[in-house]
Amino acid sequence: MGKSAVLELAEDLISRPSVTPEDAGCQELMIARLKAVGFRVTRLPANGVENFWAERGGAGPRLCFAGHTDVVPSGPLAEWQNDPFQPIIRDGMLYGRGAADMKGSLAAMVVAAERFVALHPAHSGRLAFLITSDEEGIATHGTRHVVDWLREHGETIDWCVVGEPSSEKVLGDVIKNGRRGSLNGRLTVHGIQGHVAYPDKADNPIHRAFRPLADLVDQSWDAGNDFFPPTRLQFSNIHAGTGANNVIPGQLQADFNFRFSTESTPESLQAGVHKILDASAMRYTIDWQLSGPPFFTAPGPLVAATQKALQAVEQRVAQLSTGGGTSDGRFIAQLGGQVVELGPVNATIHKINECVAVADLEHLAQIYMEIMVHLLETANGR
């Protein structure tokens, strides 16, 4: 028995070393397949990043499948059981960098579209793809760039399925129907450098920062809601000092991150931080960077179609979740449509010996096609 179309495409994509922001020819491979079944393709490169928008159909609601061709670095090659860019199958698992995050999903999307078009060549609505090579990196010139282009052209997306590896233990046990926002801050506490033997001639920023930093950690920012856990602040880096044990440092720098719910806004969190720090006696500055606001898709047509697809293929009812890190869904949601994430099991993503179950690839293609059928055909009375 030969390999399935999904497996063959997944292997071809994995074999291309597209370490972020490189694409290594992955998108041209996808574009050729999509053009062959009638998709109109617009390439949207930006600052060394490869992006494309592909669409089929002329009018009606738009269903988009989104994903990224870039992968994280492989890590130490000696620790891999195989070359990370020479995919192999072992014990029913496909191994290679990007197998789960997210070249397996990309292969499933493309094959699902091919099969859908073969069965429904005159389908209602519009079927689209939004693909980038800048998701694992700074994510500035990728999906965000394509979304800006769509907005400039007055285009919207009604429904979007992002192929991120959402599953926890088995395929389709979790659907991500939202993500928390992410806000970064770099706090600099300004002191006066001096000799530790003469503290009255210096101003120690470490001492100044102790209580305010503890107050930030202890602060309750919000209580969350039915769909999001409470907003949390975490410090990731703190640095002060020259390395010498007889020098009071002149400044302290602390990096922190908020993962925040829809109960908070970047503005409310910034105001809360400044209120706590202003109550202290220290001199400070903060540089803020918003990675993305939270987004949430309430149960509706897209969630229902995704659940029905999972029931049809996997006989499974998925848990809806907003947990985990950020994704490109945060940019797509700004166009006003419904967004979910559904993809393979995420147990090995970004790890040595990343892998995906071969059987799950075929099932995922079936699930994606069922979503297409439900939203573009069944829901429209076709």
Curated annotation (Swiss-Prot):
The reaction(s) this protein catalyses: N-succinyl-(2S,6S)-2,6-diaminopimelate + H2O = (2S,6S)-2,6-diaminopimelate + succinate
Pathway membership, UniProt: Amino-acid biosynthesis; L-lysine biosynthesis via DAP pathway; LL-2,6-diaminopimelate from (S)-tetrahydrodipicolinate (succinylase route): step 3/3
Signal peptide segment: none
Any one GO biological process: diaminopimelate biosynthetic process
Residue ranges that the Swiss-Prot or TrEMBL entry lists as coiled coil: none
Gene3D superfamilies per the UniProt record, alphabetical: Zn peptidases
InterPro entries: ArgE/DapE_CS, Bact_exopeptidase_dim_dom, DapE_proteobac, Peptidase_M20, Peptidase_M20_dimer, Peptidase_M20A
Needed co-factor(s): Zn(2+); Co(2+)
Binding site for Zn(2+) 2: 101, 136, 350
Cofactor note: Binds 2 Zn(2+) or Co(2+) ions per subunit.
Pfam families assigned to the protein according to its UniProt record, in alphabetical order: M20_dimer, Peptidase_M20
GO molecular function, one term: zinc ion binding
Annotated positions binding Zn(2+) 1: 68, 101, 164
Catalytic residue list: 70, 135
Entry-linked HAMAP family: DapE
Protein family membership: Belongs to the peptidase M20A family. DapE subfamily.
Function: Catalyzes the hydrolysis of N-succinyl-L,L-diaminopimelic acid (SDAP), forming succinate and LL-2,6-diaminopimelate (DAP), an intermediate involved in the bacterial biosynthesis of lysine and meso-diaminopimelic acid, an essential component of bacterial cell walls.
Quaternary organization: Homodimer.
Protein name: Succinyl-diaminopimelate desuccinylase
Organism of derivation: Acidithiobacillus ferrooxidans (strain ATCC 23270 / DSM 14882 / CIP 104768 / NCIMB 8455) (Ferrobacillus ferrooxidans (strain ATCC 23270))
